[in-house]
């Protein structure tokens, strides 16, 4: 029993930061979930595991990964968060110009609205899924996106797309392989990423899984778009099957991430991606039931 208790405590303890500026209690620094207001609210950087770092805001996850061939950044947050992201990267002791590759999850302004700004500051190359390329090049939402009418109010600066990577494709960067998993649940171009992170003899597969929420504009009805529903369900199955020792999500609240990074909840938990996908599946079923009842 003592050994089990010690194991539970160690699994919840925050990793000691190994770089200046890294926080051991990002949850306290951010405070209670503020929703939309947190999307550009500065947060201190925090260690995730080994060479992976949280450099996002209080409401939007941005992940920085060290490799021997340079840095990789996944997502940027909205445009007004870009200066905070760059500041967090510098606080960890990195030069943003060390970023060589930019990856992304959904093609929405809250997660990649700052991509053009970060790209200009770093010169890094942007990799996208096929169905996200149009939105990133134009700065405008895909008309097939259930949130298109909402997203039209928040156009993004067009970004330079350097590489289009299909689902299952990967990038080998400095010995770390980043694999793209298309999961068009939240948006047509949604993508999740997995990579291996080793700390000493402990190696984990990190899954940065895109949102499982099927959100839409008020006048959009999923039960009138069977192809979109089928795509969303396929995306949920993809997330359920991800290799997933450690789950990250684009909105930290989607996986209690800030508490987990602060040692207030276990960083890892069994079947995390499967549980995350199941919650999204339940919400989609509830949405379809409400639409059916409103007919």
Predicted regions and their residues:
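Bacterial N-terminal signal peptides
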Residues: 1-10
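N-terminal pre-domain segments of enzymes
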Residues: 16-44, 283-294
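Acidic/histidine-rich helix-loop elements
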Residues: 27-30, 34-43, 76-80, 138-152, ...
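Conserved beta-strand hairpin/beta-sheet module of binuclear metal-dependent hydrolase folds
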Residues: 38-92, 96, 192-214
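Divalent metal-coordination and catalytic microenvironments
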Residues: 51, 65, 75, 85, ...
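Active-site HxH/HxHxD metal-binding segment of metal-dependent hydrolases
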Residues: 52, 80-83, 90-170
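Metallo-beta-lactamase
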Residues: 71, 78-80, 160, 170-172, ...
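Binuclear metal-ion centers of metallo-dependent hydrolases, dominated by the metallo-beta-lactamase
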Residues: 256-295
